[in-house]
């Protein structure tokens, strides 16, 4: 169903959507905002049941698909959509979605843990990479960024609608009966020396300080050129795809 929405940037509905940029308000209402066609397209294709409402300027293939899926679509002027969104260019569409339920995967083979990862761009990119590598779940522990932070959501490019993720305690993750690995530049063993065919939890830490002292196996990513190291998102991509290739033989 398509209807006409608010025409004033000062309307209560616009203000309520804009407040989703605030973490406390998001948690209170259990809602978050998806901005741009890619994220909204993935929500419509994979989790239409969590979409409360799509706001759109003009016509789009995404809004047509949403209407076919029974999702509420509301037409708004461009200035109203801009007032709702954090980004300067939301590309004419945004969606209010309910928080996603998390179901613990059965017999997981590849799990990603982000501990104290503060940068939303890194968190979103790693979640997207985990999705691409076929990981079973992503856990955010410690003081990691809120997964419903707007920049995290945008950085996932819709992958948060594909892969289960949740916030939990690190101890719960460490209790998993899987091989647990963490990267370290001073580790005694390199990535290629590890049996990655085993079901594995990859643990990635804070961008500046790494991980706390943990009783898990440390693995070094070999540097063949002159770079000092890889950034967090790049290191995660190397590790996750190494596991994905090994597990798929």
Where are these regions (language model features)?
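Amphipathic alpha-helical repeat scaffolds
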Residues: 36, 118-125, 229-235
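Short loop/helix-cap segments at secondary-structure boundaries that form the rim of catalytic
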Residues: 62-69, 104-107, 174-175, 194, ...
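Short, polar loop motifs at secondary-structure junctions
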Residues: 37, 57-62, 99, 170, ...
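Arg/Lys-rich RNA-binding interfaces used to dock onto structured RNA substrates
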Residues: 1-120, 143, 244
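RNA substrate-binding interface of SAM-dependent RNA methyltransferases
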Residues: 96-187
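Active-site/ligand-binding-proximal alpha/beta "capping" segment
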Residues: 182-228
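Short active-site oxyanion
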Residues: 28-31, 50-53, 70-71, 136-138, ...
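Structured adenosyl-cofactor binding patch, chiefly the S-adenosyl-L-methionine
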Residues: 95, 129-133, 144-161, 213-249
